């Protein structure tokens, strides 16, 4: 078992019955010229987050954790995005950006597009699981819950973008399904001003889960590995 120092208190988990979840590390969310950038959100500080996710993934994989990668988006015709009868049609900033800039139609978050692809620095490896998702939460219309339960996984460690949207939405839904959720704060990035990051982390550590960081996470996994060898 691994004990991870976190806020508001430490949490203990078995790495081999836990998953590291990488949320939406796509060009859309982390690269200049991607959806968030074109929609007016600042993505200039995402590079350190990418590096920290690389570090966390390497440590988690070595410890035997399942790695799950999410990609947010829809089919090329945007049927999966929902029409006017869906609140997603009205609230998705990607869909609104394309309606306001018709030349972008079919380019934002469309499966197969550059925007939809994971950033070059973060590539899934054999044994990892890659899941598409059509909404903010990774539990909505995906097999995530079934995948986790069939493997006896109850603890989820979250990284990715955006902390205050898809990361928090997935962690919250997991909380209601009896999963223990931890966010590595320096391996996440918000959509919007910095206060959005702080508010999301406050909500998570106060009501829905735990907050730690990449160095602490890696040290905890390393200590567990040494203990097993000894």
From Swiss-Prot:
Lineage of producing organism? Bacteria, Pseudomonadati, Pseudomonadota, Gammaproteobacteria, Enterobacterales
- Give its E.C. classification number: 3.5.1.110
By sequence similarity, the record places it as follows:
Belongs to the isochorismatase family. RutB subfamily.
Function noted in UniProt: Hydrolyzes ureidoacrylate to form aminoacrylate and carbamate. The carbamate hydrolyzes spontaneously, thereby releasing one of the nitrogen atoms of the pyrimidine ring as ammonia and one of its carbon atoms as CO2.
GO molecular function term, any single one: hydrolase activity, acting on carbon-nitrogen (but not peptide) bonds, in linear amides
Q: What induces it?
A: Up-regulated by the nitrogen regulatory protein C (NtrC also called GlnG) and repressed by RutR.
Gene, per the UniProt record: rutB
Q: Which PANTHER family match?
A: ISOCHORISMATASE-LIKE DOMAIN-CONTAINING PROTEIN, PEROXYUREIDOACRYLATE/UREIDOACRYLATE AMIDOHYDROLASE-RELATED
Per its record, the protein catalyses: (Z)-3-ureidoacrylate + H2O + H(+) = (Z)-3-aminoacrylate + NH4(+) + CO2; (Z)-3-ureidoacrylate + H2O = (Z)-3-aminoacrylate + carbamate + H(+); (Z)-2-methylureidoacrylate + H2O + H(+) = (Z)-2-methylaminoacrylate + NH4(+) + CO2
Any idea what this protein is called? Ureidoacrylate amidohydrolase RutB
Q: What class of enzyme is it?
A: hydrolase
Entry keywords, A to Z: Hydrolase
Which GO biological process categories is it annotated with? nitrogen utilization; uracil catabolic process
